Amino acid sequence: MNSIVNFSQQLIQNFQEVSQRTAADSSNLKAFAYLGAGLAMIGVIGVGAGQGYAAGKACDAIARNPEAQKQVFRVLVIGTAISETSSIYALLVALILIFVG
């Protein structure tokens, strides 16, 4: 247990030293903000691929059973809206990092 406490204290100390060094150089801070924004937008790739896959499966389901079109479409729209929220949050984080950070 003592080693975990020592490790966490060393980790916090290292983070403080790094933050003090990077805060002294604002160009590094802006570069890290752009890097973080780019990394935040990587999550959007998975959302786009997942939505495309879901839309394809919905088209397959409607082609197999045209009478269930309304129910499949309703579930597709709800699922798309739910999965789109993560990409909107990623975009929001990226914009905050670029313009505020």
UniProtKB/Swiss-Prot annotation:
GO molecular function, one term: proton-transporting ATP synthase activity, rotational mechanism
InterPro entries listed in its UniProt record: ATP_synth_csu_bac/chlpt, ATP_synth_F0_csu, ATP_synth_F0_csu_DDCD_BS, ATPase_proteolipid_c-like_dom, F/V-ATP_Csub_sf
Topology class, membrane: Multi-pass membrane protein
Entry keyword set: ATP synthesis, Cell membrane, CF(0), Hydrogen ion transport, Ion transport, Lipid-binding, Membrane, Transmembrane, Transmembrane helix, Transport
GO annotations of cellular component type: plasma membrane; proton-transporting ATP synthase complex; proton-transporting two-sector ATPase complex, proton-transporting domain
UniProt key word Membrane: yes
Subcellular location: Cell membrane
Site (Reversibly protonated during proton transport): E84
Transmembrane segments: 31-51, 81-101
Oligomer and partners: F-type ATPases have 2 components, F(1) - the catalytic core - and F(0) - the membrane proton channel. F(1) has five subunits: alpha(3), beta(3), gamma(1), delta(1), epsilon(1). F(0) has three main subunits: a(1), b(2) and c(10-14). The alpha and beta chains form an alternating ring which encloses part of the gamma chain. F(1) is attached to F(0) by a central stalk formed by the gamma and epsilon chains, while a peripheral stalk is formed by the delta and b chains.
Task of the protein: F(1)F(0) ATP synthase produces ATP from ADP in the presence of a proton or sodium gradient. F-type ATPases consist of two structural domains, F(1) containing the extramembraneous catalytic core and F(0) containing the membrane proton channel, linked together by a central stalk and a peripheral stalk. During catalysis, ATP synthesis in the catalytic domain of F(1) is coupled via a rotary mechanism of the central stalk subunits to proton translocation.
Family in the record: Belongs to the ATPase C chain family.
PANTHER family per record: ATP SYNTHASE LIPID-BINDING PROTEIN, MITOCHONDRIAL, ATPASE PROTEIN 9
Name of the protein described by the UniProt record: ATP synthase subunit c
Organism annotation: Mesomycoplasma hyopneumoniae (strain J / ATCC 25934 / NCTC 10110) (Mycoplasma hyopneumoniae)
Gene that this polypeptide is encoded by: atpE
